[in-house]
Curated annotation (Swiss-Prot):
Family stated for the protein in its record: Belongs to the UPF0354 family.
InterPro entries given in the database record: DUF1444 (IPR010838)
HAMAP family: UPF0354 (MF_01548)
Pfam family, one: DUF1444
Name of the molecule in the record: UPF0354 protein BCG9842_B0431
Length: 270
């Protein structure tokens, strides 16, 4: 059987049929939206991507997507009822892993220097989610992660920019407590990548700033290093004094690149 986007839409609608959910199908964009009837919050599924996975994994691909959508929508509903938002926050890898003995925080690895934690934010109170709180929320770790990333993508952004020695620096500093969190917004990073002509360098020196730089020469690397160190020293919640080159969805710490460059130079001289 040849799988098409239309057939995949029908398969997913069968798997996800629930009285409290609605479906909307955009045949032009080949996107299926599944949303809650009451809140109108939902998930968009790009069908060609699921079809490509189906070509490899068959029924398992459909099961995985259906599970992801179901978990995310259930988490959204619980969050809606609790009156609080779950958002990811970036912290240093040296940040404590436990709220107290025997009660670890819910965490996800991010880069060699950073880790993702999850905050329950009700505007009045802000608390990092640990295992005990997770049980009270009646959520799974996966639901928390899906919900947090969904909410992170909804955070607005407006950059200020400055150009020094041909290098352009973009600063995000809304002071909403989640500026560094925007580093998790893949579509934001991709849109910046498209407008950048040189190396794309990203830094989160503390929780209230995100720096994205278009680096075209060695001076630019020196500037971003000094800038990141300065912000790191001044930050209320410091994260890392290192910046990262962003390429193909991966973050490479600058000091690793510098070491590699030195090794290459050494070989050439030898």
């Amino acid at each position: 059987m040849k799988m098409t986007s239309k057939k995949m839409k029908d398969e997913l609608m069968k798997k996800l049929s629930r009285p409290e959910w609605d479906f909307q199908y955009d045949s032009e964009k080949e996107v299926l939206r599944i949303e809650q009837k009451d809140s109108k919050k939902g998930i968009n599924v790009s069908l060609p991507g699921v079809v490509a996975k189906w070509e490899v994994n068959k029924e398992k691909a459909i099961e995985e997507v259906a599970y992801y959508v179901q978990e995310a929508l259930i988490a959204m509903h619980k969050e809606e009822n609790s009156g609080a938002k779950i958002l990811p926050v970036i912290r240093s890898t040296s940040f404590p892993k436990q709220a107290e003995e025997g009660n670890p925080f819910i965490m996800t690895d991010h880069t060699a220097e950073t880790r993702i934690y999850y905050a329950l934010d009700s505007n009045k109170t802000y608390r990092l989610i640990d295992e005990r709180l997770l049980q009270k929320l009646e959520l799974t770790e996966q639901q928390v992660r899906e919900m947090a990333l969904f909410n992170a993508r909804s955070l607005g952004y407006e950059f200020k920019q400055d150009t020094v020695a041909g290098n352009t620096f973009y600063f995000l500093n809304t002071n909403d407590g989640y500026d560094a969190t925007r580093i998790l917004n893949e579509s934001l990073l991709q849109s910046m990548r498209e407008k950048i002509s040189g190396d794309m360098v990203v830094a989160v020196p503390h929780q209230d700033v995100l720096i994205i730089a278009d680096i075209v020469n060695e001076i630019g690397y020196d500037i971003i290093a000094q800038m990141t160190m300065k912000f790191f020293a001044e930050g209320h919640v410091p994260i890392t004094s290192l910046s990262f080159v962003y390429e193909d969805g991966e973050f490479e710490p600058i000091f690793i690149l510098a070491k590699n460059r030195k090794k290459t130079d050494g070989k050439e001289k030898g």
